[in-house]
Amino acid sequence: MKPKTKKKLIRVLTLYLPMTFFLLFIGIPLLWALSLSFREGSSVIKGEFQFLPDPITIANYVYVWTRNRLNRYFVNSMITSFGSVFVIGFLALFNGYAMSRFAFKGKRIFMVILLMTQMIPLIFNMSSIFLMMVKLKLANSLFGICLLHIASGLPYNSLMMKSFIGGIPREIDEAAAIDGCNRAQIIFKVILPAVRPGFTTVIAYAFITCWNEYLLSYTLLTDAKKFPVSVGLKYLVGEYSTDYSALAAGCIIALIPPILLFAYVQKHLVSGMNAGAVKG
């Protein structure tokens, strides 16, 4: 075997083959759920194997969207996710700029504490969080869920923004200041365009985290009209029986916003993650 052919074979076996297995491991369940969502519930109960549904029906989507309040759950998730992401994005930008550009006493300790907050599992603090939200009368409210999303997501995203902004030379700030820009203008007109891939990464990561959040919403929300999609899907599982076709349709609907977001920002997302890895 030629050395060049041998190298190519080794590369395929060590890189592409594991990636193919990983994609199949992730992709087959998604394709199976998509197939289930277009099948009649009776065929699933009977255990009939049909990868391609016959006949194809959208009744499951209509059922979960209208009769199981998924439309309401979807709106609630949009409200909490976009509301939280808007605040997280700009506060992370300001925090990242401050940590990158300013030298203040206790800066290193402050950053270590920020990082340590991400090492504590959320469930460890659930009892204290629940009592605090009840005392503040913010339990069972979407506003309270937004505040908790912001509090839990801000530390890590601030450190990410610090990493991205740290890769921009300080001379750019000084040149903008000489041209008459104040601090806010430097951040929004100079820094933000320069770190757009990184800022997009922060926004995408924060949105997906908020959209997929389950524990806080399940613990604090008692009014079914305020449930997000992640909690609402649980109630598609019956006590004695489950319509798996309807459940699959609900899961596919819940996947649409993150998939659309990733498809839209994937170019910036990949470059931003690479930049963060290099600049960190």
Each PLM stretch: what is its role?
Residues 2-280:
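A structural signal for multi-pass alpha-helical bundles of membrane permease subunits
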